[in-house]
């Protein structure tokens, strides 16, 4: 039986638990103007997307989707470090208005939060989702249906949050959704803890990469992200590959992001994130007009109270220092809201 849009919305509103597929009625009739076709459209028309899906699913047999390289057979129900099952686990799917302005536009970024995570930071603000694994298991066909729903209600993109461990499911769902009419860009919203080999499977499919670069020091990464000592090496290599694939941030005539790299860096107390080194690395390895968001919203969450160096929020001075470093190294693609926050802080001094 064909599921109508009304039935889907009725069934998708699951409160107090895992899925909140918010319909936002005031935006339901909005039509976003899309410039051209997204990358996955070209791959499908060239006959390459089906091959990529098959190749990606093969990684489940001996899972090495992320740098942990657990080697478990997820096809047989084994679970590795991230604790993810074979089926994709989704916590929420809804328009999100707190992302970067070019992603949000007027009608929101179509954000899908996946449960579980391959990094498991001790300060994670989404720890019930990423670490405890709250969410509902759905088939790839259901994920495709969510993508279509988000497009139908006017979202400007499909924003895939914490996608690394479910990348094969995403690829299959995207192909299914394309056949049903999906035509908006894919945003790969990742912690940055990626393998270049895996990212190459996404070449031509992902339109916008939205990675974190959390740390520039191996000891900090090991301490605060569950032993991921190789995080700086893996994240910087991953970002270089992302830049090779999609280049710099591009928007349409309405200011809506269509493609490109958008880097996030969270300022942490006591210079834990290595922000000065981060700014220098971007300046030396990427175009200086690369989109960079210096984030000020660190707060103490999950197990951060157990670690003295990060057991407080950041100070105004720490944020201003971070922005000064970005400008000192000539970064001109700074997120406009970060710049406005900086200016407000300076005026209040």
List each language-model region with its residue ranges.
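Auxiliary Fe-S-binding modules of radical SAM enzymes
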Residues: 2-5, 9-23, 29-76, 247-349
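Residues immediately within or flanking Cys/His clusters that coordinate Zn2+
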Residues: 60-63, 67, 79, 111-114, ...
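Iron-sulfur cluster-binding cysteine motifs and their immediate structural context
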Residues: 65-83, 122-129
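Conserved Radical SAM active-site core
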Residues: 83-204, 208, 218
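Conserved radical SAM core fold
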Residues: 130, 167, 192-195, 213-232, ...
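Hydrophobic faces of well-ordered beta-strands that scaffold small-molecule active sites
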Residues: 158, 186-188, 209-211, 261-263, ...
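Non-cysteine beta-strand/loop elements that form the S-adenosyl-L-methionine
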Residues: 203-217, 291-297
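Anionic-ligand binding region
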Residues: 233-252
């Amino acid at each position: 039986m064909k599921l109508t849009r009304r039935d889907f919305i009725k069934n998708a509103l699951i409160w107090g638990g895992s899925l909140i597929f918010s319909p936002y009625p005031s935006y339901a009739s909005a039509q976003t103007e899309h410039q051209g076709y997204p990358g996955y459209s070209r791959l499908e028309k060239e006959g390459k997307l089906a091959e990529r899906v098959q190749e990606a699913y093969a990684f489940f047999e001996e899972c090495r989707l992320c740098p942990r390289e657990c080697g478990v057979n997820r096809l047989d129900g084994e679970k590795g470090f991230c604790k993810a099952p074979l089926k994709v686990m989704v916590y929420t799917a809804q328009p999100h208005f707190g992302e970067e302005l070019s992603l949000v536009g007027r009608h929101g970024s179509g954000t899908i939060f996946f449960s579980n995570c391959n990094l498991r930071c001790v300060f994670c603000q989404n720890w019930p989702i990423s670490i405890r694994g709250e969410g509902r298991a759905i088939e790839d066909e259901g994920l495709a249906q969510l993508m279509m729903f988000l497009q139908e209600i006017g979202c400007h993109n499909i924003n895939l949050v914490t996608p690394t461990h479910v990348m094969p499911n995403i690829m299959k769902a995207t192909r299914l959704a394309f056949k049903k009419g999906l035509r908006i860009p894919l945003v790969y919203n990742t912690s940055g803890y990626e393998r270049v080999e895996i990212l190459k499977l996404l070449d031509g499919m992902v339109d916008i990469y939205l990675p974190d670069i959390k740390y520039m020091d191996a000891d900090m990464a090991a301490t605060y992200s569950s032993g991921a000592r190789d995080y700086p090496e893996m994240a910087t290599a991953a970002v270089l590959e992302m830049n090779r694939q999609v280049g710099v941030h591009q928007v349409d005539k309405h200011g809506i992001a269509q493609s490109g790299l958008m880097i996030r860096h969270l300022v942490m107390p006591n210079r834990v994130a290595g922000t000065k080194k981060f700014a220098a690395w971007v300046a030396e390895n990427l175009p200086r007009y690369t989109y960079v968001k210096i984030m000020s919203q660190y707060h103490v969450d999950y197990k951060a109270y157990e670690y003295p160096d990060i057991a407080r929020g950041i100070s105004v001075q720490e944020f201003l220092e971070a922005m000064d470093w970005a400008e000192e190294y000539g970064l001109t693609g700074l997120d406009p809201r970060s710049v406005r926050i900086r200016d407000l802080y300076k005026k209040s001094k």
